[in-house]
């Protein structure tokens, strides 16, 4: 760990070229310039060969350590020379007042290996038909060479008309560059493009800001998506381009260096932006070298190859995680600089509120519009704790929406020159706790503190998780971004508008005696990720030290530490344990100890799930957590030693169901005949409403024949499917396979067999998007299941094609048997790679080994499934050790991802 670990502004060691020198001597000979090509070489086949040689040379040079900047310049020059040679070959130099102009990225001179080559054929007057045909042949040849050429053929007047009407065309023209042809014509175009009649700065600037905002929204306003677009994601190359476009239009600056001369960029900021651009260029260049066609997305299947090409080291996914950590940190810096510089441009170009005087807030700060500003630009350097005073001011003053550009510049400067972390200053610690105690702590202070790297400057541990990704399909965000989203979700529980989505949490949150302790637990719940070891245990220790430093008493410190250590407990218990088993509830309640701790924990659990992945939270998970919460609350109120009377519960369920059925004037004798066939477990694990629903239909049905019921009301957050059928081997596998083939995910299964051998199985299913089964699919699913039940012999179900994304993940199959309080059941946990037909395959193995399944709880976590199965042997007893071992071997063999889902 380096001495500047609390500094968020240090350049990653891999930012220029990890483990390799930059700009080493060329390892292969530079291909000849296209200007030297003889006429007989200017055919498609020969030119293709020359282009392939040049691409190979680019790759070889890059791998030998030559900088991306030099190779981008080299490709731009090579394409310039090729187009110049072809321009003369086609005789365009003889056409008066005609020019070939590079526009867009090509105009900027930024040609990566697969970049588009955008050109404009510019003429004073419309081309003749003959000349137009010749231009068509020229462009067709470029396309035949497999170059990504975008072209337009326009007169000067057409260019100006199109440019005035379309900001994208205008931007292309602003960064246009002459390749060959009539220089005077090109200069005339430039003169018009940079005149106030074309796109005045006062119109161009807001248009580019709106364009950037729209682009950011497409990427959910974060560069932290785990498959980012290097060019277009927030903090990517486009954000640097936006600065250059505005500077070029307003100041005439053609580079970052020239922006320093105009006084709108300091030398340090220029250097930082160049570092960021250089890093992003290296990643983009490497990505283009491994792809067959143009794309800028760092998809999962590309990340390892790019990381290896950039010489990131480590086992397994470590190279990817290191590269992506550097990427996210760089994009954070670009985003902050982009925000600050655009605000400076805003003042210079639009001169907003120039006449409005700043309004003093106190001796240190003032308001400019709705932005907080320093009254003494050296305050942060002289008194670093004033940084925390500013954020405490922001949390208390709802009129403040952000930080003024020059103050942000001073904040960045002071941040870099901190002698020690801010949390070492007593006043800063007091201010931090005051911030946490405010109802709007997250949105008004912690979020901007994170955005401007002040959280990192305050507590060095935070810096460890900034940009920390996890190479899986479950975690949609980096650890720091996820943590901020947890905090925002917790703050939303204080808002009545959140009640429809989270009724329980909105009810409980105001009853928490100290919400700041929950925020502190959220801040630390994943702080130890990426360090090795159990992140929950390590984080619990970290927060104890933090609590001691910040003056929390023993009770407060122990509560926060317990929340961090047990932040996964409620989620795991609800989703991967049998929460209808009183012993499970009793064990969970013993760990929780009090209703107050239960309220804190359920709030943290819900926020954690919601902030992990946008698709993760659904009504099924909500119903599980509510069920666990209320069962635990009841247990805590009853007392830990008092377990529920199961016989009384069975009796109560039967009486309640009977009362419901009597309203329908049912035949009670026939009902008694059906119920007498059922074991006590059936009544214990179904609600009175479920029992009545089953009975109504069974009373009207030939009970010796199969019956499939699909509930029209979402039950426990999903659609309930009830199956009544003569029991037989492979029945569960057949049903699970049919549901999987219909693209339904099973989340829960309750398996019962009547005294006379009838299967009475209940499945809770969801659509792929987490919603209950669509009404228009009910009849089709019911018919398909009836067909499966009537088949005399089990047939392996046809399996859906696996998701392409699953190809890039390997999850070892793990089988674990949980300790139980009974000798009648075994509780088996299974972790494996998610794959089509998985549940059916598992069911086949159970049937092969003559095991009976009594319940299943299915959790899909990204590319991984983590399931719980309740099993018994053929004698209705718990599995003996030798049978457990055999089952483990069969499951591991059948679900091995290397056999089932090919890895790239």
Curated annotation (Swiss-Prot):
Domain HD: 479-601
Signal peptide: none
Gene Ontology biological process terms from the UniProt entry: regulation of nitrogen utilization
Necessary cofactors: Mg(2+)
Domain of life (superkingdom): Bacteria
Low complexity: compositionally biased ranges: 7-23
Reactions catalysed according to its record: [protein-PII]-L-tyrosine + UTP = [protein-PII]-uridylyl-L-tyrosine + diphosphate; [protein-PII]-uridylyl-L-tyrosine + H2O = [protein-PII]-L-tyrosine + UMP + H(+)
Regulation: Uridylyltransferase (UTase) activity is inhibited by glutamine, while glutamine activates uridylyl-removing (UR) activity.
Keyword annotations of the record: Hydrolase, Magnesium, Multifunctional enzyme, Nucleotidyltransferase, Repeat, Transferase
Chain positions covered by the region annotation Disordered: 1-25
Location of region: Uridylyl-removing: 361-719
Domain ACT: 720-801, 827-904
GO MF annotation: an example: [protein-PII] uridylyltransferase activity
Family designation: Belongs to the GlnD family.
Domain comment as written in the entry: Has four distinct domains: an N-terminal nucleotidyltransferase (NT) domain responsible for UTase activity, a central HD domain that encodes UR activity, and two C-terminal ACT domains that seem to have a role in glutamine sensing.
Job of this protein: Modifies, by uridylylation and deuridylylation, the PII regulatory proteins (GlnB and homologs), in response to the nitrogen status of the cell that GlnD senses through the glutamine level. Under low glutamine levels, catalyzes the conversion of the PII proteins and UTP to PII-UMP and PPi, while under higher glutamine levels, GlnD hydrolyzes PII-UMP to PII and UMP (deuridylylation). Thus, controls uridylylation state and activity of the PII proteins, and plays an important role in the regulation of nitrogen assimilation and metabolism.
NCBIfam families given in the database record: PRK01759.1, PRK05007.1, UTase_glnD
Protein's recorded name: Bifunctional uridylyltransferase/uridylyl-removing enzyme
């Amino acid at each position: 760990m380096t001495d500047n670990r609390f500094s968020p502004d240090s350049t990653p060691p891999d930012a220029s070229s990890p483990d390799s020198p930059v700009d080493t001597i060329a390892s292969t000979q530079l291909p000849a310039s296209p200007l030297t090509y003889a006429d007989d070489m200017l055919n498609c086949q020969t030119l293709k060969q020359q282009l392939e040689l040049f691409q190979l040379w680019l790759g070889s040079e890059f791998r030998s350590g030559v900088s991306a900047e030099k190779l981008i310049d080299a490709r731009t020059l090579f394409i310039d020379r090729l187009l110049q040679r072809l321009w003369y070959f086609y005789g365009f130099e003889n056409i008066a007042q005609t020019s070939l102009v590079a526009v867009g990225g090509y105009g900027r001179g930024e040609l990566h290996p697969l970049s588009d080559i955008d050109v404009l054929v510019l003429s004073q007057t419309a081309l003749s038909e003959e000349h137009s045909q010749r231009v068509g042949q020229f462009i067709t040849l470029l396309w035949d060479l497999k170059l990504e050429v975008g072209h337009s053929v326009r007169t000067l007047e057409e260019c100006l008309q199109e440019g005035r009407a379309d900001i994208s065309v205008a931007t292309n023209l602003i960064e246009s560059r002459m390749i060959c042809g009539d220089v005077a014509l090109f200069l005339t175009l430039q003169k018009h493009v940079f005149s106030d009649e074309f796109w005045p700065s006062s119109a161009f600037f807001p248009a580019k800001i709106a364009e950037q905002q729209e682009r950011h929204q497409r990427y959910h306003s974060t560069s932290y998506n785990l498959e980012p677009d290097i060019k277009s994601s927030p903090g990517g190359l486009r954000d640097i381009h936006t600065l250059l476009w505005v500077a070029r239009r307003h100041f005439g600056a053609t580079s970052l260096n020239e922006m320093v001369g105009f006084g709108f960029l300091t030398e340090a900021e220029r250097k930082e932006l160049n570092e960021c651009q250089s890093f992003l260029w290296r990643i983009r260049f490497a990505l283009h070298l491994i792809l067959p066609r143009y794309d800028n997305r760092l998809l999962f299947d590309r990340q390892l190859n790019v990381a290896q090409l950039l010489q990131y080291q480590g086992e397994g996914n470590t190279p990817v995680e290191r590269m992506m950590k550097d990427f996210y940190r760089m994009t954070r810096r670009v985003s902050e600089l982009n925000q600050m510089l655009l605000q400076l441009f805003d003042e210079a170009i639009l001169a907003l509120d120039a006449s409005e005087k700043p309004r003093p807030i106190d001796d240190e700060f003032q308001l400019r519009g709705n932005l907080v500003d320093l009254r003494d630009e050296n305050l942060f350097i002289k008194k670093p704790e004033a940084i925390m005073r500013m954020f405490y001011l922001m949390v208390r003053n709802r009129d403040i929406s952000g930080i003024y550009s020059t103050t942000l510049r001073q904040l960045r400067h002071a941040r870099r020159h901190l002698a020690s972390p801010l949390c070492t200053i007593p006043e800063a610690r007091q201010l931090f706790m005051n911030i946490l105690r405010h109802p709007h702590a997250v949105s008004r202070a912690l979020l901007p503190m994170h955005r401007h790297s002040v959280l990192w400057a305050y507590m060095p541990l935070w810096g460890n998780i900034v940009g920390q990704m996890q190479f899986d399909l479950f975690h949609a965000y980096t650890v720091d971004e996820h943590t901020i989203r947890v905090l925002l979700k917790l703050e939303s529980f204080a808002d009545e508008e959140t009640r429809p989505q989270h009724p329980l949490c909105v009810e409980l949150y105001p009853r928490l005696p100290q919400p700041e302790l929950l925020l502190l637990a959220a801040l630390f719940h994943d702080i130890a990720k990426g360090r090795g070891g159990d992140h929950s245990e390590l984080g619990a220790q970290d927060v104890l030290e933090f609590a001691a430093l910040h003056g929390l008493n023993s009770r407060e410190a122990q509560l926060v530490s317990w929340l961090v250590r047990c932040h996964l407990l409620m989620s795991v218990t609800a989703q991967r344990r049998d929460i209808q088993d009183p012993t499970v509830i009793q064990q969970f309640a013993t760990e929780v100890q009090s209703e107050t701790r239960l309220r804190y924990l359920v709030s943290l659990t819900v926020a954690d799930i919601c902030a992990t992945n946008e698709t993760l939270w659904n009504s099924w998970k909500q119903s599980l957590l509510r069920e666990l919460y209320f069962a635990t609350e009841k247990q805590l109120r009853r007392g830990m030693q008092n377990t529920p009377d199961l016989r009384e519960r069975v009796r109560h369920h039967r009486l309640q169901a009977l009362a419901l059925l009597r309203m329908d004037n049912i035949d009670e004798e026939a009902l008694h005949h059906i119920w007498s066939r059922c074991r006590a477990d059936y009544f214990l694990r179904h609600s009175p409403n479920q029992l009545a629903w089953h009975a109504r239909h069974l009373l009207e049905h030939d009970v010796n024949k199969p019956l499939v019921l699909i509930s029209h009301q979402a039950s426990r957050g999903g659609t309930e499917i009830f199956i009544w059928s003569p029991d037989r081997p492979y029945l569960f596998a057949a049903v699970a396979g049919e549901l999987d083939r219909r693209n339904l995910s099973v989340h829960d299964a309750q398996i019962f067999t009547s005294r006379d051998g009838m299967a009475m199985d209940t499945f809770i299913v969801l659509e792929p998007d987490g919603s209950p089964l669509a009404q228009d699919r009910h009849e089709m699913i019911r018919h398909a299941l009836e067909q499966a039940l009537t088949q005399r012999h089990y047939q392996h179900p046809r399996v859906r094609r696996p998701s392409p994304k699953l190809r890039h993940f390997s999850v070892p199959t793990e089988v674990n048997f949980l300790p139980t309080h009974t000798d009648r059941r075994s509780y088996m946990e299974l972790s494996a790679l998610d794959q089509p037909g998985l549940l059916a395959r598992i069911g086949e193995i159970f049937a092969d080994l003559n095991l009976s399944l009594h319940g299943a709880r299915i959790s899909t976590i990204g590319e991984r499934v983590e399931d719980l199965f309740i099993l018994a042997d053929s004698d209705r007893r718990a599995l003996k050790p030798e049978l457990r071992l055999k089952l483990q071997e069969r499951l591991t063999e059948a679900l091995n991802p290397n056999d089932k889902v090919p890895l790239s």
